[in-house]
């Protein structure tokens, strides 16, 4: 018969078991921009340029879709995506800064966005539920990702088989808070994703590029870093 100490013994034995090691990913082999905050520009300025409307049209966002806004910040895209996908659609807004996540949660509640969920992710893993999203948006944030290969390796699992990753960034050096389109294409290709659409956005140097799943997810130790 087990004594009263038995549960503690079981816990101790369990803790002694070898834990699976974290997969090893290649480093970026390029500059990574520092995180400068959750606001890229004022919402009024972005609305005047029609940025969100351009991007959502290019991405083919429709009512009833499930979409993720990764690196959502203060929620400029989150609230606009919520309106387009409607009551039958879903938006997951993710950020890695707890205070930003909390502020966005308050906004979602204040604006009664019942089709939006807010969650905290990690710098190298947005922690998206598997095969859940028609579109995953990365808007003016990818150049700040410290471990792009780990990030994309995890992120691609959140896509439905016919889903797309929609990236918006500026066509300029990473040091100036952008990423050249050629570099972006190379890094996505390393994770088995190919571009399906590219367009320069009006009103600045920002571009839109969408990617689909083209090949199986590679093992982390087989990923070939761009520029390595």
PLM features per residue range, with description:
Residues 124-136:
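A short acidic, Gly/Pro-enriched loop at the edge of an enzyme's catalytic core
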Residues 63-64, 87-88, 159-165:
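Short glycine-dipeptide loop
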Residues 199-228:
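Core SAM-dependent methyltransferase catalytic element
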Residues 164-187:
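Conserved class I S-adenosyl-L-methionine
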Residues 134-148:
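A short SAM/SAH-binding and catalytic strip from SAM-dependent methyltransferases
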Residues 82-83, 149-164:
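A short glycine-rich, Lys/Arg-flanked "PGG" loop and its adjoining helix->strand segment in the class I
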Residues 17-68, 76, 106:
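Class I SAM-dependent transferase core
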Residues 68, 73-126:
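Class I SAM-dependent methyltransferase SAM/SAH-binding core
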